[in-house]
Amino acid sequence: MSIGILGKKLGMSQLFDEQGKAVPVTLIEAGPCRITQLKTTETDGYSAVQIGFGETRDKLVNKPAKGHLAKSGEGVLRHLSEYRVDDVNGLELGGAVTVSDFEAGQKVDVSGDTMGRGFAGYQKRHGFSRGPMTHGSKNHREPGSTGAGTTPGRIYPGKRMAGRYGGKKTTTRGLTILKVDSDRNLLVVKGSVPGKPGALLNIRPANRVGAKPAKGGK
């Protein structure tokens, strides 16, 4: 049973299928993750599993977190994540969650922070068309109209404008696991995932599995 796992993006590569077609893949170093807490309906009101990933220096973790992590084993962990489950039977505090809990062909959802690109303009951030480049135009990469005048006398919230681009959490759904390497803690996932190499990723079984419905709901 795969509940979910934390990992680190290593980068992208490619595999060749049986027809010799190149398939883009992402290599993810996932786990091993330590089970740091088991939540039950009797004590917490719901059933869940909390896991930790990525050992870090002792001085970077405060005392409450150290006390919490000490209940599940030695060593402090940098990242924690919780997954809802139907039942925690069969799971043990201090146990390990590894890539062997996943299998090739399984669909997963991968969450992470997108690449931060800093302050960006209208064209780069939103894909706006630019203005004329010649004939005396000075409106090359400007936004154009941002709204009416005296009425409403303001710019409506949500107006697409220049600003910080990227660096936000997003989820890529329905990715297929092509290969599982238990010896090297690797997941080979078809396609791309959020973030740059070294970024933290949250991998969990897909919650939307099946063919997409046709337009009109038929």
From Swiss-Prot:
The keyword Signal does not apply. Gene3D superfamilies: 3.30.160.810, Translation factors. Keywords: Ribonucleoprotein, Ribosomal protein, RNA-binding, rRNA-binding. GO terms for cellular component: cytosolic large ribosomal subunit. InterPro entries: Ribosomal_uL3 (IPR000597), Ribosomal_uL3_bac/org-type (IPR019927), Ribosomal_uL3_CS (IPR019926), Transl_B-barrel_sf (IPR009000). Pfam families: Ribosomal_L3. One of its GO terms (molecular function) is rRNA binding. It comes from the Bacteria. The keyword Ligase does not apply. Residues 125-168 are annotated as: Disordered. One of its GO terms (biological process) is translation. One of the primary rRNA binding proteins, it binds directly near the 3'-end of the 23S rRNA, where it nucleates assembly of the 50S subunit. PANTHER family: 50S RIBOSOMAL PROTEIN L3, LARGE RIBOSOMAL SUBUNIT PROTEIN UL3C. Part of the 50S ribosomal subunit. Forms a cluster with proteins L14 and L19. Belongs to the universal ribosomal protein uL3 family. This is Large ribosomal subunit protein uL3. It comes from Synechococcus sp. (strain WH7803). The lineage of its organism: Bacteria, Bacillati, Cyanobacteriota, Cyanophyceae, Synechococcales.
